[in-house]
Design a protein with these regions (language model features):
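Subset of outer-membrane beta-barrel
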Residues: 1-299
Length: 299
């Protein structure tokens, strides 16, 4: 639901957008009410900087995903080079880092073959699909990851395309078990429409993502009032409706919340998903102004 606030997660060209250093953190609880439902924690730091007369930005991001017996951690460094083009600024960026995927094989429900029919266990001890135990914490595999993208922004609209997991890393758990990470294409864009009374700003946006096997689309309409309060609605074609809220607590400090309600069969099992984020923008070095547009996603 918060894709417009954390664009460098999927497009490194959007890192360091604006004139401020930024710290961003979020925590998401997916599908509450379902046992062992996924949980995602995300953290990032980014900063623009100037070298001579050229404009750059760099950052780092970390994500920790837990879903059932799986745990996924990723750490990436991000860089973007930006320059004036037409009425806006074009950024070209890349990120690189590592993905680590763990599986708690010791926690799999193992039963003897004779018990399978009665107890409906998922596996038996001789199941070749299970990776060999890799110690107290199960098994894990790590791979090098690379992504790239372009991003364009003017005073009234923005758009970007990117491709994540260019290396399509294979995470090796054992000689018999491995996980292949598919490359993913993203396209996102939005428009900023200031109403006549100047107090209201409407911000429709959309994002498409696909690994060329499956695909999903996010559609969002956000409104901002008095340069401080934000609220909106979103819809995912994969099957959910989002309610988004946010506000500036003090100058530079933002807090936001998203509630995602399933719009499919999951609604009978889950109370929905909750996401909370906190973002802070600050300026320690006080560089010379570059006259880049102030990002409406981090006001």
């Amino acid at each position: 639901g918060q894709y417009m606030y954390m664009q460098s997660t999927y497009n490194p060209a959007a890192v360091g957008d604006g004139d401020l250093m930024r710290v961003y953190g979020s925590h998401r609880m997916h599908f509450t009410g379902i046992m062992d439902a996924p949980m995602t924690t995300y953290f990032s730091f980014s900063s623009p900087f100037v070298v001579g007369k050229t404009q750059h930005a760099a950052g780092v991001r970390f994500m920790n995903d837990r879903f059932g017996l799986f745990s996924n951690q990723s750490l990436h460094a991000e860089y973007a080079y930006r320059f004036k083009l037409g009425k806006g600024y074009l950024s070209v960026g890349a990120d690189f880092g590592f993905i680590n995927l763990s599986f708690a094989v010791d926690s799999v429900n193992l039963k003897e073959v004779a018990d399978l029919v009665q107890d409906h266990a998922y596996h038996n001890a001789s199941d070749n699909a299970l990776p060999e135990k890799g110690g107290q914490n199960g098994v894990s595999g790590m791979g090098f990851d690379l992504g790239a993208g372009v991003y364009y922004e003017t005073a009234t609209w923005w758009a970007g395309v990117s491709y994540g997991h260019l290396t399509q890393p294979t995470l090796q758990w054992s000689d018999k078990a491995e996980v292949h990470v598919r490359g993913t294409f993203y396209a996102a864009g939005g428009y900023n429409w200031r109403l006549r009374n100047k107090q209201w700003l409407l911000m429709p946006s959309a994002m498409l993502q696909t690994d060329f096997v499956g695909w999903d689309v996010n559609l969002t309409m956000m409104a901002q009032v008095s340069e401080r309060y934000r609220f909106g609605l979103g819809y995912r074609l994969a099957g959910s409706v989002n309610i988004l809220l946010g506000m500036d607590i003090i100058d530079g400090l933002q807090v936001g919340y998203t509630y995602e309600l399933p719009a499919n069969g999951l609604i009978r099992e889950s109370y929905g998903s909750h996401e909370l984020y906190l973002a802070y923008g600050f300026n320690i070095l006080k560089p010379k102004r570059t006259n880049r547009y102030k990002s409406v996603r981090y006001l």
